[in-house]
Amino acid sequence: MNRRKFLTISSGVAIAKFPFHSTIVSHHALESGQASSPRTERRPVLVRAGFTRRASGSEEPTTSQQTVVRSLDSEGRLAVFVVPVGEHEPYRGAPLHVHHEQDEWIHIVAGEFVAEVGGKRFRLKPGDSLLMPMKIPHRWSIAGQPHCGAIHLYTPAGLMDISWDPSPNDNIRQTPEQRKAEFEKYGMTLLGIPLTREEIELTV
């Protein structure tokens, strides 16, 4: 599933669905040497505009989010995603969650986003960037302007590149228990809901 497809929970608040399916080497395996033995030859990874990189290493056209660096490209060091500049639904974003092993970084290319890290909120504008460290609860959302774009980076990569891939369960509404279990399976804990429209608009 595309990470920017959103579900609406019973409270009426839209949340980003994080899809996951385990086809990638874990960070623990990388640390233990399982993923780098034998060591593969490193090579440049070029992803053209309008294309996304799949787990197989192939590329395919996309009109939505792009995976441009996968865990296997960087020996697990990082994963990079692009929300291409275009029209996206405002007031949508990630629920409150915490990564146990990944730092998350966002750079704003166009439009505005609002992020909350450790209870402190930031309005991010073009050219701004924000590090959301591991083990600190955070959430982010597109602000009121539909025209926006951003770059997301996770280090180490963990399973985050899989979270951006399409999934057969994209359109299946999950129970809160299923959502929490999904987050835990991939090294995160789901803590709460996304930023509300009022919270976004009050952040300056």
Indicate residue ranges for each PLM-predicted region.
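Glycine- and acidic-residue-biased ligand/ion/polar-headgroup-sensing regions
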Residues: E101-F113
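A short glycine-rich, His/Asp/Glu-containing loop-to-beta-strand
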Residues: S58-L96, Q102
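Short acidic-glycine-tyrosine-enriched beta hairpin
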Residues: G119-M134
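Double-stranded beta-helix
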Residues: R139, A143-V204
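C-terminal segment of N-terminal export signals and the immediately downstream linker at the start
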Residues: F20-S58, V204
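N-terminal export signals
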Residues: N2-H27
